[in-house]
Structures are given as structure tokens and as C-alpha cells.
Amino acid sequence: MSRLEAKKPSLCKSEPLTTERVRTTLSVFKRIVTSCYGPSGRLKQLHNGFGGYVCTTSQSSALLSHLLVTHPILKILTTSIQNHVSSFSDCGLFTAILCCNLIENVQRLDLTPTTVIRLNKHLLSLCISYLKSETCGCRIPVDFGSTQILLCFVRSVLTSKPACMLTRKETEHVSALILRAFLLTIPENAEGHIILGKSLIVPLKGQRVIDSTVLPGILIEMSEVQLMRLLPIKKSTALKVALFCTTLSGDISDTGEGTVVVSYGVSLENAALDQLLNLGRQLISDHVDLVLCQKVIHPSLKQFLNMHRIIAIDRIGVTLMEPLTKMTGTQPIGSLGSISPNSYGSVKDVCTAKFGSKHFFHLIPNEATICSLLLCNRNDTAWDELKLTCQTALHVLQLTLKEPWALLGGGCTETHLAAYIRHKTHNDPESILKDDECTQTELQLIAEAFCSALESVVGSLEHDGGEILTDMKYGHLWSVQADSPCVANWPDLLSQCGCGLYNSQEELNWSFLRSTRRPFVPQTCLPHEAVGSASNLTLDCLTAKLSGLQVAVETANLILDLSYVIEDKN
């Protein structure tokens, strides 16, 4: 069939960052992500023009998945951030804001993209080396033998998501539950390479947050009538389990384009049922106590198994198959033929449970590396946001188990890092440039743009007109409320720095963020007594933050290096 209209030529635009449309698009995107940042970030409601589901969030994962992006440059930016978030769960907004700030700041400089990219790479390498070094002044070790730092981690994630709508008491309760759920996934007698279990989040919407709880094992939601039909099992030893990933309904499988030849007088339904009953007889002879099926079990097979005191539960769904396999040690059975003895697994016990208006069949494991977090919240919107936040917190703990270090949060790492870069580029530029073709003047310009981008991320934490200061000893962030007097004694207005490590009773000098000041050496090597005495720190995941920093700089470099954008308009 011929085309109804002629094919349009592709649009080719050179120097895309110089166009007003691109700058406006990036500016709008920056304002969106900046306004969401931090504990007092503003919420966003996203929905399509045809109505339907409305997403209320301030999290980057939900925000970017619901945000329709059409411009190629913005697609590069959002895709990079989404890839980072899918791998690390945390620091998505940090990455987005830093990337936008870097692009915006260097555009004001009269430097070639090649020079900017080369120096950005040098500064990124300097940041990563410092944050991984023993002398880093914003990195603390994480002791998994103590719950204090771990609770700080979880609490920091929860308090940064205002759409969860948690009170302080609820935050403490959910933090403790998340930590307990994570610890339950760690094998007790693990040596060498550790394989973590899994935490399943079970929804209980419309309930009080304080009613949330954690149980070892897996909860299978069922109706009250179904639970009443299940026979109780009284056994002193473990219960033998068979897990089926194929249908046990007796339906004839789809033959595709093939032909099924059936002899005269043979009933396919009866033949299929006979095969199912033969399978049931093998399960009985193998002393199976519990049959779980991903799909449907034929009513006759169910009744047959129940007569022999075997519990049969169907319609488990694909989501629970992997956790059930891990917890029970079964190999999912995919055929109706003879079953290998190695396919069976076991559970310690089973029982019924009721939470709110929901009824569950509770599988209790032999070893608790699979657990269920029953998560409650007042409404669907708050629950959806809390679920995402809990998943992020659990992932952050997993990342920290691999690399047991934390960065000071609340903006203190960014201001400390900016102070360190300024000092390093002013006092030891040769160590950064080495044999590079760039000059010290170019380094100073890019370093200031880089530090300003970091400080702009920190500035995004303030949404209510307050001021942000940094001290001249540690390089930490300090917040002043909007209604504070213009001329005041700073120690009277400042209580703690952003991360909560230092208080204003020390003899410190402060200056406004982004004000002109002489570069200084921020104190490195955190004293252990300072970290040990702090009980309510705000912390960031080192692994996620380093990745976010790297993704932001590399994505900014990629966008700055674009010479042409070619769009197919057909």
C-alpha cells in the first residue's frame, strides 16, 4: 500500500544546547526535581490527559516513570537517572539536580566542551578518590553489630519522603520493622559468600501505620471461607511441600497448529482427571503434607487430597513462586508425570492469621530468610509511597552490607566536598592537572562551577525561604529559619548541622552558602567519639551516592558533547 502523504525529512539541529527551547525544557525539569528534594520537598500529582490513576509523589522513581518526556536531550537525562535508580534505588533526585546544575553552570563559561568534559572527569575522579579514602571527613563506618547506625539509615530514607505522611512515632515504628525485616533475610550460619533472603511487602491499606508488623515466612491471602475448609495439620516434624508451576485444572493443553487424535469412546476430560488422580496418589505415597499450585487445581483433585489430609492451595500467582522456592527448598514441578524426590521441600509449620479485614495462610520456615512485612497506611496514595520507600530502605541496607560505609547526609557531604575541591584546586592544582593540556585558570573556572553545582543541590533542601550556612571548620551545612532576625548570634539560632553530627556550641565561624569566601581545609578523619556519641544522624548510602555522582557528571558531559540532534518526525 502506498503512503498517503510524502515522508517528511528528518530534522537536524546543530548546537542543541544553545536553543531557547532546550534551555527552557531543562530549566522546567530542574524546577520540578528541585522542588521535590528533601524532607520538606513539595509533592507532585501526575496523571494523563484522559484521567485514570493519579500518582502523588516526590520520589524520583515514581516521578520519572509517570513523567512524559519527548525532547531527545531530556530523554538522555531521564533515562540515565532511571537506570541509576533501578540499580541503587536511592539518590535519584540528587543525581538529576546535580546534572542539571552542571550543564547550566558550564554554559555560562567561555570554554570549549572538550575542556569542560576533561576537567569534569578530573574533578569526578578527585571526588570519588576522596570519598573512598581513609582521610575522608564525611564518611563513617557501619557496624552491623549495632542497630543504632542502621536505624539512622532507615530513618533518613523515611523522613526524606513527605508523601508517606508519617508522624515521628510512626517513623520510628516503621524504621524498626524495616531493619528487622532486613536482618531476617540474613542467614544465621552464613560463612563466606552470603545469599540474602527476601522481604515481601503485604498491603494492608486503610489501617493504622502503627499496626504494621513483620512475620518470618510467607503469608498467602485467602478468604475466610477457604481457610475454614483447610484441615489443621498436627505433626512434630517438618511438613513436606510440593510446589507446582503448571496448571492442575485438567484442561487440555493448547496444541497450536497440531492435531490431537482421540480414539472412539475415549473422554479427554476423564483421561485428564485420571492423570491428575494418579498424580495425587503419588503425592500421598510420598507423604506430602502441603500442595501449592501457581495456577488452578481441579476440584476433584483438591477433594481427593483433602480426604487424605493433604492441604491443597491453588492460585498462588507468579509473584510468590520465587520466594516459595527459596523458603521451602522445593523445585517447581512443571509436568504431570512422575515426580522426583528432589523436587519436594519443607516448612516448619503452618497456621492461619488475620490482620485487619484480611485472612492469611501463614507458612512458617525452617530458617527465617524469607519474611513478610505487613505494611499499613491510611489510604492508597500514602501506602503506595510508603511501599516504595520501604523497598528503597531495604535496598540501601543490602548495598551497605556489601560496602559497610555511610556518608553524612542532610547536605553536609555536598558542602564538605565543595570545600575540599576548592581547597585542592587552589592549593594543589598540579596534582589534578598532571600532564593535561588545560590551564590552572580553566581548572579554577570549572572547579567553581562544579562546587556551585554541589552547593545548589544543598540549596534545594530549603523550600520555605530560610537561609543555609556552612561552617569554616568542618564544611557542614546549617539551616536558619525564614523568620529569624537578620542580625543575630549564630550559635543561638543554630542547633545542629544538617547531618546531626555537630552542634553550634563549638567555637565555629559560619558564612552564607555560595557567598564569596577564602578556600579553607575542611577537617578530615572523623573522630570515632564524635560518631559514637551521635544517636540521630542523617545518613546517605555511600554506594548509591557515588553512583549518583558519577552518573550526574557523565550524563552532563554527554549532553555537553552533543553537536547535533536528529529527529525523525514521521
Swiss-Prot record:
Keywords: ATP-binding, Chaperone, Cytoplasm, Cytoskeleton, Nucleotide-binding, Nucleus
One GO term (biological process): chaperone-mediated protein complex assembly
Family: Belongs to the TCP-1 chaperonin family.
Subunit structure: Component of a complex composed at least of MKKS, BBS10, BBS12, TCP1, CCT2, CCT3, CCT4, CCT5 and CCT8. Interacts with STUB1. Interacts with BBS2 (via coiled coil domain). Interacts with CCDC28B. Interacts with BBS12. Interacts with SMARCC1, a component of the SWI/SNF complexes; the interaction takes place predominantly in the cytoplasm and may modulate SMARCC1 location. Interacts with DLEC1.
Function: Probable molecular chaperone that assists the folding of proteins upon ATP hydrolysis. Plays a role in the assembly of BBSome, a complex involved in ciliogenesis regulating transports vesicles to the cilia. May play a role in protein processing in limb, cardiac and reproductive system development. May play a role in cytokinesis.
PANTHER family, sorted: MOLECULAR CHAPERONE MKKS (PTHR46787:SF1), SYNDROMES PUTATIVE CHAPERONIN-RELATED (PTHR46787)
Stated name of the protein: Molecular chaperone MKKS
Source organism of the structure: Pongo abelii
